[in-house]
């Protein structure tokens, strides 16, 4: 199997931008946990069938897809329902990510997991790459991007692993603080490093 680089970072750190640059410039395969999480509850999936069985058919939209807004309301009000949902979906997501990583054709793969530290998914990775920004940058970017107030962003930050916790697990770090920072140069340097490591990994 290809060398697996776990890519993570806090909200608005620029994970997607970094992953896209690896893909666009170096044709690196990406397995994205957010996409996998949607796939395991797609119409016709075992995940969606189990959710409907548990919550009832009114958890679906008219098109037969998962009504995420309604599901959020249900689990927000009842912590035991959230625990049930996590116990159902986390193993499914993990299995699907492992299956997808086994299909990788590039010398190494990026496993993009926003909550990699929180869900202890670093066990799936050979190295952990953290996209790092200061908290004030996260606050401003998220408020600008999502039109939310500072209090809401701080609540999200509080629910995530701290910057210190992420950096403590990092093998590599990309600084993504300012718009003019040379992101591509940092990525190019890491790409060369990962290529060399992937040859040793064979």
Curated annotation (Swiss-Prot):
It is found in: Cytoplasm. Pfam families: CoaE. The gene is coaE. The keyword ATP-binding applies. GO terms for biological process: coenzyme A biosynthetic process. One of its GO terms (cellular component) is cytoplasm. Residues 4-201 form the DPCK domain. It comes from Vibrio vulnificus (strain CMCP6). Keywords: ATP-binding, Coenzyme A biosynthesis, Cytoplasm, Kinase, Nucleotide-binding, Transferase. This is Dephospho-CoA kinase. InterPro entries: Depp_CoAkinase (IPR001977), P-loop_NTPase (IPR027417). One of its GO terms (molecular function) is dephospho-CoA kinase activity. Belongs to the CoaE family. It comes from the Bacteria. Catalyzes the phosphorylation of the 3'-hydroxyl group of dephosphocoenzyme A to form coenzyme A.
């Amino acid at each position: 199997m290809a060398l697996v680089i776990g890519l993570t970072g806090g909200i608005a750190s620029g994970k997607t931008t970094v992953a896209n640059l690896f893909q666009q410039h170096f044709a690196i395969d990406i397995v994205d946990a957010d996409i996998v999480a949607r796939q395991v509850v797609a119409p016709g999936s075992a995940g969606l069938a189990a959710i409907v069985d548990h919550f009832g058919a009114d958890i679906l939209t008219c098109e037969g897809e998962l009504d995420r807004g309604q599901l959020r309301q249900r689990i927000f009000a009842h912590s035991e329902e959230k625990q049930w949902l996590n116990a159902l979906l986390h193993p499914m997501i993990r299995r699907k990510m492992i299956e997808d990583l086994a299909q990788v054709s590039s010398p190494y793969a990026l496993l993009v997991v926003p909550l990699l530290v929180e869900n202890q998914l670093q066990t799936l990775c050979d190295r952990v790459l953290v996209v790092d920004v200061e908290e004030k940058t996260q606050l401003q970017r998220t408020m600008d991007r999502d039109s939310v107030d500072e209090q809401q962003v701080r609540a999200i930050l509080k629910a995530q692993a701290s910057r210190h916790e992420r950096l403590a697990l990092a093998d590599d770090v990309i600084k993504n603080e300012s718009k003019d920072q040379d992101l591509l140069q940092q990525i190019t340097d890491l790409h060369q490093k990962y290529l060399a490591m992937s040859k040793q990994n064979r």
